[in-house]
Amino acid sequence: MKRLSFLVTMLVALMLLASCSKQQGQQLVPEDALFVMRIDAKQASEKSGLTGDKSELSKWLKKQVKAMGLDKEVRDKVLDILDDPTKSGIDLTEPLYLYAAGDLERDPDFGIVGTMASKSNLIDLIKALDVFEVEESNGVSYCELDRDAALIFNGDWFFGGKVDDVDDMIATLKERAGGKGSLDGNKAFDKMCDKKGVMQVLFLGEGLENIPNASEMTAMMPDGLDIKDFASIVDFGLNPGEAVLEAEFVPMSQEWQKYVDKSLKAMKSIDDAQTKYISDKGLSLFLNIDPKMFLEQISNLAEAYEIDDESMEMIEDVLENFDGTASLEFSGIKDNQPSVSLYVGTKNEDALGLLLQNIGDMDEFQEVGDNQYLFPTDYDYDWESEDFSRTPTAWAALGFKNGMTYFSTDKESVFSTPREKYPVKEIKGKGLYLRFNADLFDTLAKEASGSDKQLFDALSDLFDYAECYNGEGATGVMRIVMKDKKKNPVEAIADYVKKFLD
């Protein structure tokens, strides 16, 4: 058991200490894959400060190996591998690919594939560890790891995962290596392999055909679109001072391409004027879309989503009055109430009228101006009175003014201009922009206590802000920016935790 635990530890160490520069082994991913993860182990370990001559992780692992009481031959071999991971036999200087394929409900197929550095080195390592027995079949070596799992390898590649019959799997792997039944050459897969982040994840619609309710999912899409013809790629990168996650939609048919192109045209650039009443000190959101095109998209989905005529008519009434712009701010907690303001560009007061018609009891509404109202959101109760009378203590605002239908839980903040102008350069050219400023953690910490306060303080110390927005083409981007601009998030968090533990 000690040797088995050590083997797992060693393999994790190898992944962390390895590099990744070439594009080998990707032909072993099956063509019916639903999900593929590609790992650039070297970049991940280097950017998290886990490798190098002064690597604390490497020193720690070597210390653990020496303390395990292993035979000298095994101990020396493992120490050599920690210095040079290729001596394990597995070439972790190339990408690793993890995948899920097949019928995920009845007969799922999972595996990890990659490239070999030396078949003999891997065999020597397995024999030295004395955990599994190496066997041969058709010129390929294998170890049965469990009743239905095996490690299969030759001088060029390796596979680890679910195996029903070793000989059948060997034949299948040889075919994939030759290009038959491989995902290699797939447009989306090749695009993923060209990404530069530390890790990528690919979702393939073609694989989704094998999951339950796939036909129902296609039926809920606009006419002419099929679930099998879409793919998406998520690319995760680490840079000094930030982590970046980019999600890209990859059309796999002309119909999907036309749909995406049309959808992108519905996005318009956020107007600087939308930021006038919004502060960047908390959570802020901006949107600018073409309302006519947006309504057309909803109309195309009405039947699939069973939107009845009455509801569709109400949606049309709202969107016909909508000019496409919206701005939202959450600035914290004030008097135990969330401080939220929303401004929606509308052509006239009709949208307000529609809201008032459906709001219910308006007895406590106070009209404070033309199309401007206040209504209570919190009360003090007189529990000694006969009818438990109540007195409003907090008011929200709702109305139409300056070409906008607005709502705010803080009546004092409506149409007030922040002390500092919003950093408009951050939103230039974007149609959707969401920003979370870590200053909000300071605000929340003032209202918190105990462990909650400690958490908010820690988050405020580490993070500067996070933002999400539509990027180039059919992409969405999320950036997490740290206070320390020299360290990436993994390094910064690791240093913070170490300081806390010390």
What are these regions (language model features)?
Residues 115-121, 162-166, 346-350, 410-412:
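Helix N-cap motif at beta-to-alpha junctions
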Residues 1-8:
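Bacterial N-terminal signal peptides that target proteins for export
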Residues 411-502:
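Long, C-terminal catalytic modules of enzymes
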Residues 8-16:
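Bacterial N-terminal signal peptides
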Residues 20-146, 183-229, 233-235, 241-337, ...:
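Structural boundary/hinge residues at secondary-structure and domain interfaces
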Residues 116-155, 187, 198-199, 349-402, ...:
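Short Gly/Thr-rich strand-loop-strand
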Residues 96-100, 149-154, 222-241, 323-330, ...:
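Broad, structure-driven detector of short, well-ordered beta-strand segments within folded domains
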Residues 144-176, 384-421, 427, 461-479:
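A short, solvent-exposed beta-edge/loop patch
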